[in-house]
């Protein structure tokens, strides 16, 4: 996956687990509800605007989306979710950053600590891992979809910070404030993105070999299955060869 690999990219290699589990709606509903606390008008609420876009891309029914917004604004009763980050270490000292939405912080922390302990990981103190990540807009494009010079010109003109060339993908990195402008510029140029999100990108990555890679992927899958984990980030890199070997047995 060239340079650094993102958990979201690894998940696509594995067959979009979220979709199969039906978790994607749950996550988007929580994101919409929380975003709507800052106002129901997407024009004045960038976070809600992005959440609504995700909901539409996932073909969420309009009524479901409307109710999620109304729960956020207080028009409808709903669960009060708290947002927070948890930090952990995986096999080989890999840093893991978890974005959480929970209606019971103590329960969530206890459950995730238990999952970590059972899967070659452990909880870290606040700040121990987060410094290893930068918040960035990330857009990936399959290399066959566009030539490098065209992508560079469009992305950088729209405000992108960098374009990285991987083995199979281009990765466009932006400041979070310029993410929407870059995404729109690519869409206007009919350049299809495989992934487009504001995420936490590792400053550096640690390459994992077969056993540690297998343990790390298993840990990430287990954490990802927890209902309160909205997003996962980790600073590991796994070669395409290891991923291909794993796909053949998954």
Residue positions per predicted region:
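Strongly charged, low-complexity linkers/loops
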Residues: 149-154, 180-217
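Glycine- and Gly-Pro-enriched alpha-helical subdomains that act as flexible
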Residues: 107-181, 189
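Conserved small/polar residues in nucleotide/adenosyl-binding loops
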Residues: 249-250
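Short acidic, Gly/Pro-enriched loop/turn segments at secondary-structure junctions
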Residues: 237-246
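Cytosolic regulatory modules rich in charged/polar residues
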Residues: 175, 196, 203-238
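N-terminal cationic and glycine-rich segments that engage phosphates or anionic surfaces
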Residues: 1-124, 129-138
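Short, hydrophobic beta-strand segments
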Residues: 51-52, 90-100, 131-144, 164-168, ...
């Amino acid at each position: 996956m060239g340079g650094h690999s993102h958990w979201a990219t690894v998940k696509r290699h594995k067959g979009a687990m979220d979709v199969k589990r039906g978790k994607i709606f749950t996550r988007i509903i929580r994101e919409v509800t929380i975003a709507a606390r800052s106002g129901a008008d997407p024009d004045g609420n960038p976070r809600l605007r992005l959440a609504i876009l995700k909901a539409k891309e996932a073909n969420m029914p309009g009524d479901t989306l409307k109710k999620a917004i109304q729960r956020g604004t207080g028009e409808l009763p709903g669960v009060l979710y708290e947002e927070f980050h948890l930090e952990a270490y995986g096999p080989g000292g890999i840093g893991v950053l978890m974005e959480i939405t929970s209606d019971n912080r103590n329960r969530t922390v206890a459950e995730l600590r238990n999952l970590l302990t059972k899967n070659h990981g452990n909880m870290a103190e606040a700040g121990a891992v987060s410094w290893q990540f930068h918040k960035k807009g990330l857009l990936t494009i399959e290399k066959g979809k566009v030539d490098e010079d065209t992508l560079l010109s469009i992305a950088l003109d729209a405000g992108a910070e960098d374009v990285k060339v991987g083995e199979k993908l281009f990765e466009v990195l932006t400041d979070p404030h310029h993410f929407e402008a870059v995404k729109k510029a690519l869409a206007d140029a009919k350049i299809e993105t495989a992934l487009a999100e504001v995420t936490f990108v590792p400053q550096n990555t640690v390459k994992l070999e077969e056993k540690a890679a297998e343990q790390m992927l298993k840990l990430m899958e287990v954490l990802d299955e927890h209902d309160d984990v909205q997003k996962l980030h980790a600073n590991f890199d796994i070669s395409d060869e290891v991923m291909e070997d794993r796909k053949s047995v998954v």
